[in-house]
Amino acid sequence: MKFRAIAALTALLLFAPAFGTPRATEAAADKKDLAAELDALKSQVVQLAHQAQDADDYIAIANLQRAYGYYVDKCLWDETADLFAKDGSLEIGLRGVYAGQDHVRKYLHTLPKLEYGMLFNHMQLQPVIDIAPDGKTAWGRWRAFEQFGMLHKAAQWGEGTYENEYVKEDGVWKIKKLHYYMTYYVDYYKGWDQGGLPAPGPLKDFPPDQPTTVQYKLFPDVFVPPYHYKNPVTGK
C-alpha cells in the first residue's frame, strides 16, 4: 500500500505542471477573446439592424409625403385625409389649424374638385427627414412648388416650405402635423418681380379649430420658417 501511495504521489508531481502550461493559458485567453468578439459582432448586428430600419422608415415617410402631393394634385380629398393620424392636424398658410383627422377631411372638402381646364399641382421637393431614436416619431422639412390655373381664366405660381411631424402607428407612418408656410403666391403673367398676392386667411364658412400658430408675411417680405433640425455640420 505504501508503494502504491508513493507511486501515485510521484505521478501527481510529474504531471501537475501540465495543468498550468502555456497551452492551457492560451486556450483560456482564446476563449475570452472569442467571447469578446461575439459580443462585438452582436452589437454590430443590432446597430446595422437599427440603420436598416431607419432607412426603411425614411423611404416610408418620403413616400407618405409624396403621396400627399399626388393626391392633392388631383383633389382626392378623402385619400389625402386618410394619410393623417386620428389626432393629426393641418395648417396651411394663415388659415389656422384644423385639429383631428375628421376636421382635416372636412376642410379639404371645402377646396375645389378637379374639373376640365383646372391645374392644381403641388410638387413635393427637397426633403430633410429626421427620425427619433425610438423610431416612433419623425420630422420632415420639404419644399412645395405649385402651379394653379383655370383654362383661359387665371394662372398662379406658388412656393413654400413644410415643417411636418410624423408618427408611426401599428407599423405604419402617418402625418401627425402638417404645417405649410407660404413663401410666395403670384400671378403667372406678372411674376414675382411685381410682388405677390396676400396669403389666404381663415375660411368664414368653416373656421379653424385654432388660430394661426405663426404670423408672417409673404414675399416680398422676408420670413424664414423655423427649422426642426440643427446644422448637420456644426450641430448648432
Predicted regions and their residues:
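Bacterial N-terminal signal peptides that target proteins for export
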Residues: 1-8
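Bacterial N-terminal signal peptides
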Residues: 8-18
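Short, low-complexity N-terminal intrinsically disordered segments enriched in polar/charged residues
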Residues: 25-70, 74, 82-83
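A solvent-exposed, acidic/Ser-Thr-rich amphipathic alpha-helical stretch
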Residues: 77-146
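Short, surface-exposed coil-to-beta transition loops
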Residues: 122-124, 156-162
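Short beta-strand edge/turn micro-motifs at domain boundaries
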Residues: 137-139, 159-192
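Beta-strand elements of well-folded, non-transmembrane domains
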Residues: 144-148, 166-168
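A hydrophobic membrane-anchoring alpha-helix module
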Residues: 192-236
